């Protein structure tokens, strides 16, 4: 669920985090911050990054949690995470103190009333067995209370994170607890090895941005297409074709967002967001933004119409609408657009 709990769009803290939130912040001063850090070195095969977010006194908002190549683990530090809609529409809305979500091919819808804080962990699908004790495939297209999988670790982590002095300490707590889960003294049963062909296929898809033909993947593994699809879906949660689609979309929307962030600082912003000269539009942007036709070619779509259809299917809206909805994040360079 890319983008996680919110759309923190205010001050961006350093990669190392802060030693603590300022003690003298005015009570009526809006707070809107985020902080990102990579996990400890031994965790990097399993975890891509941590993001801390804190908002107070900001306008209530809704946010789209978009498909991405990562499982999502969120620990709130105050108010529950309010899910208005899950990727699977059959799953009812709900509130979560800690949420774990698998790979998905449809957007989620998250809301807050102007106050939220928490930590998002981006989990690599091939690391799910080591950290969660189950394959990523068991979480495909669903969100679950994280304690249903991780048990009492969730309560421990949340309690310690709430009491911590700041983001640096919270991320250190995450490192400690996740290393405990993945380490040799973990109470979990040893994770069975993932078939090399499955791991290779996932890494190949990531490396090519989801543009390789599935028949070529099967030929390279030496498996039949049907066998590869079955084994891959069991482990990862999506078929190779669906995974390629998500990876391709994730690349496209990040390129679009990065260009929009750059474009927002350009003088004039001719055409504006979604206009004929602006981000998401069809005309020239003078090098400061992507035309959708160019973006489609770069990311391996047949044409602009193909990209637009895929965006509607995976984001629930056209590219221009998504950029418009998230533009305050683009202006601030929020964590939503930095690998989320």
Q: For each predicted feature, which ranges?
A:
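DNA major-groove recognition helix of helix-turn-helix
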Residues: 232, 244, 311-312, 323
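Alpha-helical bundle regulatory/interaction domains
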Residues: 1-225, 235-242, 254-266, 271-274, ...
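Hydrophobic side chains within alpha-helical segments
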Residues: 306-307, 313, 329
């Amino acid at each position: 669920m890319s983008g996680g709990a919110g759309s923190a769009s205010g001050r961006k803290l350093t990669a190392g985090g802060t030693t603590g939130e300022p003690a003298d912040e005015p009570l009526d001063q809006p707070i809107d911050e985020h902080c990102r850090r990579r996990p400890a070195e031994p965790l990097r095969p399993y975890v891509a990054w941590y993001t801390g977010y804190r908002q107070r006194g900001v306008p209530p908002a809704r946010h789209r949690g978009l498909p991405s190549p990562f499982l999502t683990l969120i620990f709130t530090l105050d108010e529950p995470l309010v899910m208005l809609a899950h990727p699977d529409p059959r799953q009812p809305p709900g509130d979560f103190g800690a949420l774990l979500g698998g790979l998905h091919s449809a957007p989620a819808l998250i809301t807050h009333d102007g106050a939220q804080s928490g930590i998002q962990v981006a989990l690599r699908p091939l690391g799910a067995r080591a950290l969660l004790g189950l394959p990523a495939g068991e979480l495909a297209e669903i969100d679950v209370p994280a304690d249903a999988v991780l048990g009492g670790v969730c309560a421990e982590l949340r309690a310690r994170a709430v009491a911590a002095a700041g983001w640096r300490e919270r991320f250190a707590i995450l490192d400690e607890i996740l290393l405990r889960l993945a380490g040799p003294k973990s109470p979990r049963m040893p994770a069975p090895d993932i078939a090399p062909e499955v791991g290779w296929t996932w890494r190949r898809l990531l490396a090519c941005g989801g543009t390789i033909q599935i028949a070529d993947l099967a030929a390279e593994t030496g498996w039949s297409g049907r066998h590869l699809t079955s084994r891959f879906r069991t482990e990862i949660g999506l078929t190779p074709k669906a995974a390629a689609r998500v990876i391709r979309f994730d690349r496209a929307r990040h390129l679009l967002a990065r260009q929009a962030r750059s474009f927002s600082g350009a003088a004039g912003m001719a055409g504006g967001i979604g206009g004929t000269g602006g981000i998401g539009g069809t005309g020239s942007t003078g090098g400061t933004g992507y035309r959708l036709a160019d973006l489609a070619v770069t990311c391996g779509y047949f044409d602009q119409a193909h990209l637009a259809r895929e965006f509607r299917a995976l984001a629930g809206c056209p590219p221009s609408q998504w950029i418009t909805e998230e533009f305050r994040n683009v202006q601030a360079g929020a964590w939503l657009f930095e690998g989320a």
